[in-house]
Amino acid sequence: MKIAMLFPYTPSYREAIYKLMDKELDVDWFFCGNAKRSLKMLDYSLLSHCDLTMEEKTFLGPVVYYKGIKGLNLQRYDVIICAGVIRCLSEWWLLQKMGKGMRKPKIFLWTHGWYGKETKVQKLIKKFFFRKVDGFFLYGDYAKNEMLKEGFDAGKLHVIKNSLDYDNQLELRKEMTLSPIYKDHFGNDNPTIVFIGRLTAVKKLDLLIKAVGILKQKGEEYNMAFVGDGEMRGGLANAAEENGLTNDVWFYGACFDEKTNARLVYNADLCVAPGNIGLTAMHVMMFGCPAISHNDFKWQMPEFESIIPGQTGDFFEYGNVEDLARSISHWFATKSNSREEVRKACYQEIDKHWNPHYQLNVIKTVLGIIR
């Protein structure tokens, strides 16, 4: 089975799943060679049969098209997998033109699918755009359930989850042992809450500092470690000072050594991501750390589904700092003596669903490569 993967660009975190697909499937890769984004991009030289001749061009406002797509001879493929970018005219063209007068490739979208916050107009546009799609690879069950509510065919909806560099992280995980890294830094045995990622406004990390401040006034003391850097670092430092937490916060900074990141996460007791948790959920659970994030799922990223309340973390009411404080306090009140049990639950969640091997199996099963 010949497969075409056609995307404007690909972030570097997808390296593991794409390399696995490249190894085990007959795939040609098509990306826009000129596409620029603020995130780190994949090194396309890691993939065989990679074509970068397409160019992403602006048509009007946010609307784009892929210059050169018509010359790719996509009719020769059995399956085309693309991103489902509704604001891209080329993807509309692809869904309309494929198969006219020739054998039609099946077209799958690897996409968020549905958020649950769409307006009536957005719903109409999406349904019209999706009507000729043969199948969807969705990041989560939430999106699948939202699409079922909208009347989509269940047989076309396939949950593929997401993944990071699982195999390399697994080797690091096997090396991990408990260490006094936080006791040495803070000089106490208080539980440590970690956040790993960019310190940006959308992460709403000020809520975490305020919540820990509330708990400190009630006699509950916690350490906080921020592993990452970003625009909000100064503001967070000021918030810590205002809440009497200067000595309880460690701004570790950005760390690009995954073994060090693993050690910092493994030895923490809880991750709190008051904004959208996204990839952070997979990262921390890979190394056995549970996570708390908000419960307004239409504003979440798909990885929130790795949080199983009472097992791998918990949720708090979106934007409610008092409820975040309650959630943190409740977690430690009920789980402080079950750290290793929680660690194993986090491992199990990632090992079962959030890894490239799971994703590849979904692709092979859906495409009929394995049964």
Per-region residue spans from a language model:
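A charged, aromatic-enriched C-terminal amphipathic alpha-helix characteristic of glycosyltransferases
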Residues: 333-367
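Short hydrophobic beta-strand element within catalytic cores of glycosyltransferases
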Residues: 290-299, 314
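A short, histidine- and acid-enriched strand-loop-helix "catalytic/donor-clamping" loop
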Residues: 89, 103-124, 132-135
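Nucleotide-activated donor-binding/catalytic signature segment of Leloir-type glycosyltransferases, i.e.
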Residues: 227, 234-255
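Conserved donor-binding/catalytic core segment of Leloir-type glycosyltransferases
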Residues: 183-203, 209-212
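Donor nucleotide-sugar binding/catalytic pocket of nucleotide-sugar-dependent glycosyltransferases
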Residues: 131-181, 188
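Acidic donor-binding loop of glycosyltransferase active sites
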Residues: 263-276, 289-290
